């Protein structure tokens, strides 16, 4: 089932320097909660500056949903320490609030209790909040409070020069984009390994279902927790952060222009379902528009091709201008065993897996095959640790035992690990392979099995409160290592100033501005 990567691995072993200079970045979302686990109702803390313009600390869907962002970094330890500093400083500024350490929220009774993220009075700020109003009206506010970690990854130019002979210009843009699309296609085919190893949402609180019927065969504990005994990541299931209405958009990952055309089509395609919501009611705007996607960011995807946008530029226009610059991996649950929601083992694994995905042959995929890959993901998400579980290839009928496929993959990853270790010295990447490959013979070592044991004993609420309290105390006591308090204060003040400048520069009424952007 695993493609034959032996030739590409042999090439890599002859060109180890091609991997020198991998760049990464991390984003982590987390809900602010009170000591009893309920959602904080306070505004975004003033000490953290403006959520609209702060470089490192912002908000996602809700006013209480923090998002931490590291700068692009070539050093894993430095990146993780930077992320930890963001958590340390924030923990000191939250008063009695703490950061929820799980992907799935628990103590939220009603979607109406969730205040949308606020970004001030500028047209840009109001647009961001209106987009969130649309998400709430389309999918419900509760789904939008599910948290995750995003891992951004790019290969150095030296890799593309050695592998594809690229120089500069239009040809380089096309070849590099083609390489990243190969990575993405392999991710759709084999990325289920991420929830298998690191999924950490095998259960949900009963309040999350809100009385809605479900066909999933949940088991229920006395305290009202619903779980699937072999599940890995309900966050990635249809119960979690997905969008069924997008499954027939026909967006493919074979060619830059095709991909962008599909995305632009979805933004312009009217939706009967969303038209029923209405765009405006009693003078209040309910969504940006009633198209399948309000804006490009609404496209749900476990992985995204990205390029840093210029002012006023859409993500797809940035891709057309310069090609794919980096990849955003979006399938990581919050790691409940780390105070910052992600750890070094995960980052090193993702490095290895991304390199493997770009090396392995990946035939082009139709939108039908893309939908078929969902079958493997769904199996792993809902019953990944089940003994005897098998996986298929695309839409074919042949089945393969998951543990065998996983171990075959890790044989390749071990060779990538040896190459990366030869550049950096030490055996850190190989150690990660040795630790993680054991999860295929013993699923009890996976994140989902470990956290489920705690949840069955303590409930999701009890587990979340205990971990959150421990991490709050730990982070508040740890000294800052990279950033200094003065730098946080300077960025707070600068972000507030930037927001004020944006607001002062706005001369156009929001309705007129929106007419041009909706």
UniProtKB/Swiss-Prot annotation:
It catalyses: L-cysteine + L-glutamate + ATP = gamma-L-glutamyl-L-cysteine + ADP + phosphate + H(+). This is Glutamate--cysteine ligase. Keywords: ATP-binding, Glutathione biosynthesis, Ligase, Nucleotide-binding. SUPFAM superfamilies: Glutamine synthetase/guanido kinase. Pathway: Sulfur metabolism; glutathione biosynthesis; glutathione from L-cysteine and L-glutamate: step 1/2. InterPro entries: Gln_synth/guanido_kin_cat_dom, Glu_cys_ligase, Glut_cys_ligase. NCBIfam families: glu_cys_ligase. Belongs to the glutamate--cysteine ligase type 1 family. Type 1 subfamily. It comes from the Bacteria. GO terms for cellular component: cytosol. One of its GO terms (molecular function) is glutamate-cysteine ligase activity. Its EC number is 6.3.2.2. It is an enzyme of class 6 (ligase). Coiled coil: none annotated. GO terms for biological process: glutathione biosynthetic process. It comes from Salmonella gallinarum (strain 287/91 / NCTC 13346). PANTHER family: GLUTAMATE--CYSTEINE LIGASE (PTHR38761:SF1).
């Amino acid at each position: 089932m695993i493609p034959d990567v032996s030739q590409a691995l042999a090439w890599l072993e002859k060109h180890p320097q091609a991997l020198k200079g991998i760049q990464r970045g991390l984003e982590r979302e987390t809900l602010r909660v009170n000591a009893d686990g309920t959602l904080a109702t306070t505004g975004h803390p003033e000490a953290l500056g403006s959520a609209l313009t702060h470089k490192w600390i912002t908000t996602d869907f809700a006013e209480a949903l923090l998002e931490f962002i590291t700068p692009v970094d070539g050093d894993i330890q430095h990146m993780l320490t930077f992320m930890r500093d963001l958590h340390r400083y924030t923990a000191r500024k939250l008063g009695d609030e703490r950061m929820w350490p799980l992907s799935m929220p628990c103590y939220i009774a009603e979607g109406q209790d969730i205040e949308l993220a606020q970004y001030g009075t500028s047209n840009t700020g109001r647009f961001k909040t209106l987009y969130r109003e649309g998400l709430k009206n389309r999918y419900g506010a509760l789904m939008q409070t599910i948290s995750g970690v995003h891992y951004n990854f790019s290969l150095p130019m030296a890799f593309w020069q050695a592998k594809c002979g690229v120089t500069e210009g239009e040809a380089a843009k096309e070849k590099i984009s083609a390489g990243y699309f190969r990575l993405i296609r392999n991710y759709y085919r084999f990325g289920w390994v991420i929830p298998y190893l690191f999924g950490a949402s095998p259960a949900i609180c009963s309040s999350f279902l809100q009385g809605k019927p479900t066909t999933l065969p949940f088991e229920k504990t006395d305290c009202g927790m619903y779980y699937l005994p072999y599940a890995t990541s309900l966050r990635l299931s249809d119960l979690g952060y997905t969008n069924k209405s997008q499954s027939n958009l026909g967006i493919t990952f074979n060619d830059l222009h095709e991909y962008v055309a599909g995305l632009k089509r979805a933004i312009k395609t009217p939706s009967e379902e969303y038209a029923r919501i209405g765009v405006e009611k009693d003078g209040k705007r309910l969504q940006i528009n009633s198209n399948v996607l309000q804006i490009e960011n609404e496209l749900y995807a476990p992985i995204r091709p990205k390029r840093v946008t210029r002012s006023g530029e859409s993500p797809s226009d940035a891709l057309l201008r310069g090609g794919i610059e980096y990849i955003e991996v979006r399938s990581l649950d919050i790691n409940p065993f780390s105070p910052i929601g992600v750890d070094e083992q995960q980052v090193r694994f993702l490095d290895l897996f991304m390199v493997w995905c770009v090396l392995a042959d990946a035939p082009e995929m139709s939108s039908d095959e893309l939908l078929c890959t969902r079958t493997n993901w769904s199996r792993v998400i809902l019953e990944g640790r089940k003994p005897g579980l098998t996986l298929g290839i695309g839409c074919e009928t042949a089945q393969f035992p998951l543990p065998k496929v996983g171990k075959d993959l890790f044989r390749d990853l071990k060779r990538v690990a040896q190459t990366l270790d030869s550049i950096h010295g030490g055996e850190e990447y190989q150690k990660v392979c040795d630790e993680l490959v054991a999860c295929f013979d013993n699923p009890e070592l996976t994140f989902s099995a470990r956290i489920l044991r705690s949840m069955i004993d303590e409930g999701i609420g009890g587990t979340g409160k205990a971990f959150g309290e421990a991490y709050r105390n730990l982070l508040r006591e740890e000294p800052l290592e990279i950033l200094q308090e003065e730098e946080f204060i300077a960025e707070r003040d600068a972000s507030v100033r930037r927001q004020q400048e944006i607001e002062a520069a706005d001369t156009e009424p929001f309705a007129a501005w929106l007419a041009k952007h909706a």
